[in-house]
A protein has these predicted regions:
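Hydrophobic alpha-helical transmembrane segments of ABC transporter permease domains
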Residues: 30, 49, 104, 108, ...
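Helix-loop-helix
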Residues: 75, 182-196, 266, 270-341, ...
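An intracellular "coupling" helix at the cytosolic face of ABC transporter transmembrane type-1 domains
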Residues: 38-41, 136-137, 153-162, 166, ...
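ABC-type nucleotide-binding domain
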Residues: 80, 363-640
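Transmembrane helices of ABC transporter permease
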Residues: 39, 43-56, 60, 97, ...
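Juxtamembrane helix-loop junctions of ABC transporter transmembrane domains
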Residues: 18-26, 49-50, 57-73, 97-144, ...
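Membrane-integrated ABC transporters
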Residues: 1-58, 73-94, 108-112, 116, ...
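Short intracellular "coupling" helices and adjacent cytoplasmic loop segments at the cytosolic face
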Residues: 13-20, 117, 125-149, 153-155, ...
């Protein structure tokens, strides 16, 4: 059990394997900001103005120190009766400057919350919209928990980057430029001293960031693996307990969890030392500038005054702080880019191709007995076939399915179906039997184009199904899948899922046809009983009866029943079989069953072995041949 799950999910990376790196970080950042600007450009312009105002207010407040000391405090110390009026007025002015800066910072934060959450909502919507367009094979090849991790963890990494990191970087850049210009004008000598220390800070930050960045990327990917493993184990919890593999499953989780711990520990170990290192280097820069400034003031070098030194030290702090913040935000951005890489990788997955142009429409017969399109639901369906010459023809949907020389493989190098030839005429019941892995379910997956064939043709009412739009093709099919899935909602809503515009009366009629009405009425709230957790409060037989009712309400001309009665007890099977016989009457039906007794009345039984049809005929004909079907039937070897 555990081994099977490990094969499906991404296995742990070997210790000696190189750590992943973000590909094209500049392109990723451009795409992220493109998503922001597409919907929130005016907001971003206001935020930029707020950031500029806030940064300039802080710089202006630092510059005020020089005037405060040289023009007010020092002269007042030399007065017998100092006048505090000018000083008070100056303090009020600088207080107003601070207030404007605080207001701008508050407005910036408020707007960025709206921008960030709106952008994340849009990304999740785009992800879900695109995910629904992906082919089935994508979900066969990717652990579902890993896909869920993209929606949660990876999208959330963008939250801090958009709400804090990028605004902080912009603010830091504006602050650095304005403070640098002010420092140069105030004292180029002290500016040189400051820049030497800044160069050392940048060198240390770059080294630390380069070491932590690769581990942040690994952390996001390892987190996806852990989520994938948890999701799989939750789905298979009953199987784990049946085979008492709890310890083996726990060992698999610990291995992945330890891998996540190691990558997260390495990432945060480096990230957490950036601020202390840059802060201490900033303190050293402050002390060196204080000593140099004091010496210059005492020596009268360059007209340096006490006010100049105090103002420059304030600017020095204002200069070092954004550099430290840039270093800290760099790791947040790297982690966000790692998440963005996974987000855009999913969004860039090619959608399910559909080159069909034949559509399914409601139809009726006009007074000349010609088939014409109508907007009303008449119970008559037609294929609308546009032609190159601009004309359109309508062909009544009959339910005639034909396979001609069909080959198929899930991967190009391995063919699993060979030279399949069969047909289902309107109203016929075609049954597939054979051992596990013979290709029965694969054939039904080809009818609804979950997968496209490698060679040959499948025709629906004489039309190559590749010419039919997939949505219209699937609307013409009623499908009961091998694994019944029920959605969170009422029983009525789950039945109506087969045709969303169906009335309550039509849903109840479908339930009666599937012989589900009896047990539904015995539920606490009948048809309004809430189902949760994939219908866990229902038996397997009841869940399959609802799936059959869901197919019945769609009222399709063609039915695909993929092992619909394989997990139902004998009594329930009898109920289902009676309902299905009524449902299949007049419809082309393709049936796969574990119990051969359920397909005795089929018009044609196809026996598959290793992807080939080795026998075909009615039940009596195949029994008379005494071949594979005879062995399966008399030996009760179906699916064993």
């Amino acid at each position: 059990m555990a081994q099977a799950k490990e094969v499906r999910g991404p296995g742990p990376r070997g210790a000696g394997q190189p750590r992943p790196k973000v590909e094209n970080p500049g392109l990723l950042l451009k795409r992220i900001m493109g998503e922001v600007f597409q919907h929130y450009l005016p907001h971003c312009i206001i935020v930029l103005i707020c950031i500029v105002v806030s940064a300039l207010a802080n710089v202006q407040a630092s510059l005020f120190l020089k005037s405060l000391i040289d023009d007010y405090i020092v002269p007042m110390t030399q007065q017998a009766a100092p006048d505090f009026g000018p000083l008070t007025a100056a303090l009020i002015r600088v207080g107003c400057i601070y207030a404007v800066g605080v207001l701008a910072a508050w407005l910036n934060a408020r707007i960025m919350v709206n921008v960030t959450q709106g952008t994340l909502r849009n990304l999740r919507t785009q992800l879900f919209t695109h995910m629904e367009s992906l082919p089935i094979k994508y979900f066969d090849q990717h652990p579902h928990g890993d896909i869920m991790s993209v929606y949660t963890n990876d999208v959330d990494t963008l939250r801090q980057m958009l709400s804090q990191s990028i605004p902080q970087l912009v603010s830091s850049a504006i602050t650095i430029v304005s403070v640098f210009a002010s420092m140069v004008m105030m004292s180029w000598q002290l500016t040189v001293v400051t820049m030497c220390m800044v160069a050392l800070m940048l060198f240390c930050s770059k080294k630390i960031t380069s070491m932590s960045g690769k581990y942040f990327i690994a952390q996001q990917r390892d987190l996806g693996k852990v989520n994938g493993y948890i999701e799989e184990m939750m789905e298979g919890q009953k199987v784990v307990k049946v085979f008492t593999h709890e310890q083996k499953t726990l060992a698999g989780f610990r291995e992945l969890n330890d891998k996540l711990k190691d990558s997260a520990k390495q990432a945060n170990a480096y990230a957490n030392i950036i601020m202390p290192v840059t802060a201490q280097l900033g303190n050293i820069s402050y002390a060196v500038c204080a000593l140099a400034g004091a010496a210059m003031a005492v020596g009268g070098i360059g007209g340096t005054t006490l006010g100049t030194v105090m103002a420059f030290l304030a600017l020095n702090k204002s200069f070092n702080m954004p550099i430290s913040q840039v270093s800290m935000q760099a790791n947040s951005i790297i982690m966000a880019l790692a998440g963005a890489e996974r987000i855009f990788k999913l969004m860039d997955e090619p959608s399910e191709t559909d080159e069909g142009y034949v559509t399914l429409v409601n139809a009726k017969y006009d007074k000349d007995d010609n088939l014409v399109e109508t907007s009303d639901r008449t119970g008559i369906w037609a294929w609308k076939h546009p032609h190159h010459d601009g004309t359109t023809t309508y062909h009544k949907l009959e339910g005639d399915i034909t396979f001609t020389d069909v080959d198929f493989g899930y991967v190009p190098e391995k063919t699993v179906l060979h030279n399949i030839n069969l047909y289902g005429r309107p109203g016929q019941k075609i049954a597939f039997v054979g051992s596990t892995g013979a290709g029965k379910t694969t054939i039904t997956n080809l009818i609804n184009r979950f997968y496209d064939i490698s060679d040959g043709k499948i025709r629906y009412d004489g039309i190559n199904i590749s010419k039919i739009k997939k949505d219209d093709l699937r609307r013409s099919l009623g499908i009961v899948l091998q694994e019944t899935h029920l959605f969170t909602g009422t029983v009525m809503e789950n039945i109506r899922y087969g045709r969303l515009e169906a009335t309550d009366e039509e849903c109840i009629a479908a339930a009666r046809l599937a012989n589900a009405d009896g047990f539904i009425k015995r539920l606490p709230d009948g048809y309004h009983t809430m189902l949760t957790n994939d219908g866990a409060n229902l038996s397997q037989g009841q869940r399959q009866l609802l799936a059959i009712a869901r197919a019945a309400v769609a009222d399709p001309p063609v039915l695909i029943l993929d092992e619909a009665t394989s997990s139902i007890d004998t009594r329930t099977e009898a109920l289902v079989q009676r309902g299905m016989d009524g449902l299949m009457y007049g419809r082309t039906s393709f049936v796969i069953a574990h119990r051969l007794s359920t397909v005795r009345n089929a018009d044609c039984i196809a026996v598959l072995e290793q992807g080939r049809i080795i026998e075909r005929g009615s039940h009596d004909e195949l029994i008379a041949k005494k071949g594979k079907y005879y062995q399966l039937y008399t030996g009760n070897l179906a699916e064993n």
